[in-house]
């Protein structure tokens, strides 16, 4: 099938809203992306056409005296871009990754499916969210999000891309992240510097990049801030590290952080916040921290007792492949498509 993916915030090539839908589709479906907050241009990323709506600058910030007008203009621009791309791509339906995208597809009168990657603050009984879900052909959400009326389908990535390695020593830690307040990258910098000798890299992009780069310059080379890498290049990147770190504020009771799955599949020892999904589901496979100082202590302990972590790393690899295989959501998604789009699926 031909699927137009509509989203507000996705970073093409990098974020979970890019990786998990494309891994879900595999080679069975063709995709095109419309991204509300991306620059207004058309390009191709990993062979996938991407159109930015261009809701930036003045339109991206609240207007004190005319906020309703600004929102109406933003919604209109997003909706018209979705309509145009739907026709140009000859799409079968729109896959919406958030409520804003779903609202635009609904207003456009197009067939749409909700695959909720991001909650925009609406509660389950919010009338706007209910209208969006009721108007969808079907709706799904991540298993840690619990949206009433949405089928829970894990947002798994294809772990077969990653190469499991058993490094002889632990010398460098990685934070693969969005560089924004929610992911608190400064905690990683402070944690590395509170350890005795660990070195680490932040790989990603986001609005705090300039400030984090400045912090890293003051570490004497122990912490670097590196550019993001594309989805298909992440396995090669992980080969250079031994410890994977996941920071992040407690924005939900259980936070699904896809990077942790990649860490574990690649043989990295994982240190994460206690509310990350794996820390809740398999606490014996990771270490958790509440403060930069505690992160530094874990880094020292793991480095000092690296060989002793081997059984844990092996169990983590087996557990993540067993519980987060992409074949499970692919099978569930395929079944839903056959139920709701039998003619298109049989083409």
Can you describe what each PLM-predicted range is?
Residues 183, 232-234, 244-262, 271-281:
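Nucleotide-sugar-dependent
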Residues 210-238:
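Nucleotide-activated donor-binding/catalytic signature segment of Leloir-type glycosyltransferases, i.e.
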Residues 1-42, 193, 275:
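N-terminal subdomain of nucleotide-sugar transferases
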Residues 4-6, 165-201:
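Conserved donor-binding/catalytic core segment of Leloir-type glycosyltransferases
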């Amino acid at each position: 099938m031909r699927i137009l993916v509509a989203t507000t915030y996705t970073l093409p090539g990098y974020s979970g809203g890019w990786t998990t839908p494309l891994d879900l589709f595999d080679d069975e479906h063709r995709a095109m992306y419309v991204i509300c907050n991306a620059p207004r241009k058309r390009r191709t990323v990993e062979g996938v056409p991407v159109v930015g709506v261009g809701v930036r600058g003045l339109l991206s910030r609240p207007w004190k005296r005319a906020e309703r007008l600004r929102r109406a203009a933003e919604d209109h621009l997003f909706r018209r871009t979705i309509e145009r791309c739907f026709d140009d791509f000859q799409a079968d339906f729109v896959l919406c990754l958030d409520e804003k995208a779903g609202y635009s597809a609904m207003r456009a009168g197009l067939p749409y499916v909700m695959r909720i990657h991001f909650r925009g603050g609406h509660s389950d009984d919010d009338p706007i969210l209910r209208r969006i879900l009721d108007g969808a052909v079907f709706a799904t959400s991540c298993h840690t999000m619990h949206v009433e009326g949405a089928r829970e389908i894990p947002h798994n990535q294809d772990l077969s891309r990653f190469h499991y390695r058993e490094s002889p020593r632990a010398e460098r830690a990685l934070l693969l992240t969005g560089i924004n307040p929610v992911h608190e990258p400064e905690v990683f910098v402070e944690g590395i510097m509170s350890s005795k000798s660990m070195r680490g890299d932040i790989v990603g992009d986001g609005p705090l990049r300039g400030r984090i780069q400045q912090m890293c310059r003051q570490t004497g080379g122990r912490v670097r801030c590196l550019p993001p890498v594309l989805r298909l290049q992440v396995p090669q990147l992980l080969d250079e590290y031994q410890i994977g770190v996941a920071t992040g504020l407690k924005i939900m009771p259980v936070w699904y952080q896809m990077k942790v799955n990649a860490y574990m599949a690649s043989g990295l020892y994982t240190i994460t916040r206690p509310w990350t999904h794996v820390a809740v589901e398999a606490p014996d496979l990771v270490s958790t921290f509440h403060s930069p100082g505690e992160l530094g202590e874990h880094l020292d302990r793991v480095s000092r007792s690296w060989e002793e972590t081997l059984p844990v790393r092996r169990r983590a690899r087996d557990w993540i492949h067993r519980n987060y295989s992409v074949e499970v959501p692919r099978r569930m998604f395929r079944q839903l498509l056959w139920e709701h789009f039998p003619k298109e699926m049989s083409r």
